[in-house]
Amino acid sequence: MESLQDRAALLAWRKRQGHQNIGFVPTMGCLHEGHLTLLREARQRCEQVVVSIFVNPTQFGPNEDFDLYPRTFEADWALLEAEGCDALFHPTVAAIYPPENPNLTHVTLPALAGMLCGAVRPGHFDGVATVVTLLLNLVRPTSAFFGLKDYQQFTVLRSMVQDLAMPVEVIGIPTVREPDGLAMSSRNRYLDAPARAQAVALSQGLNRAYHAYQEGLHDATALAHLVEQTLRQAGIARIDYVAVRDALTLQPWQGKGAPVVLIAAHVGAARLIDNLVLGAQPIPSVTQE
């Protein structure tokens, strides 16, 4: 596996690959089975796979966990090498955001970026969209792979690729879960034993909504109430939102098309997100020719 630490090294690596199909998996490190599932899917579909590890400061708010975010580079390297990753791009902050150019262009998606997580984390999705645009322009992959655990992020990036006619396929991979249903996340490391026991209520609430939907409950407010009730019964008091939205647009669900239930809640020291699409309609990948 090649180590690429700056833009020049990445561009030189990309030039050597010529017209091969390139799969790209952007991450912030602290890798777990969810990330490795993305890599394996890229490995199956593409001739070369590059992973990035970059804890992006512009997607963290002033009172969030940028400095505390777990960084496990040596363990991450070993996992990627064992999985057959071809190249790892692990730049410094200065390599991505040159200090001599403080007024960099920013990418924003006002409609999608200001709702749900964007409403409680102002600027978060602008930071995500900007860094992913830059990474896609540097890597120039055939396909980019994202987990659907962060459903709003996937929707934001899929919309961005469509709107800007970027020549890349955006592929969403289903959430990987622990045996008890908890969605895998790097922030699960923040959970102590009592919080870990509470956290499973997120997936339990989603399953409760799923079964109610299948049995004919198609009222968005009632479905959200079921989920919130499950969280509060587990002792989770700080809930940012429980929302039922259209699975394709993230607009409020009006009873047509597939609904997705989205949760953001604080459990112990961690802010956790999860979601579940209740209908049968799949979430398509996006390809721009």
UniProtKB/Swiss-Prot annotation:
Belongs to the pantothenate synthetase family. It comes from the Bacteria. InterPro entries: Cyt_trans-like, Pantoate_ligase, Pantoate_ligase_C, Rossmann-like_a/b/a_fold. One of its GO terms (cellular component) is cytosol. It holds the Pfam family Pantoate_ligase. Beta-alanine binds at residue 59. ATP binds at residues 28-35, 147-150, 176, 184-187. GO terms for molecular function: ATP binding; pantoate-beta-alanine ligase activity. This is Pantothenate synthetase. The active site is at residue 35. The reaction proceeds by a bi uni uni bi ping pong mechanism. HAMAP family: PanC (MF_00158). It comes from Magnetococcus marinus (strain ATCC BAA-1437 / JCM 17883 / MC-1). The gene is panC. The keyword Nucleotide-binding applies.
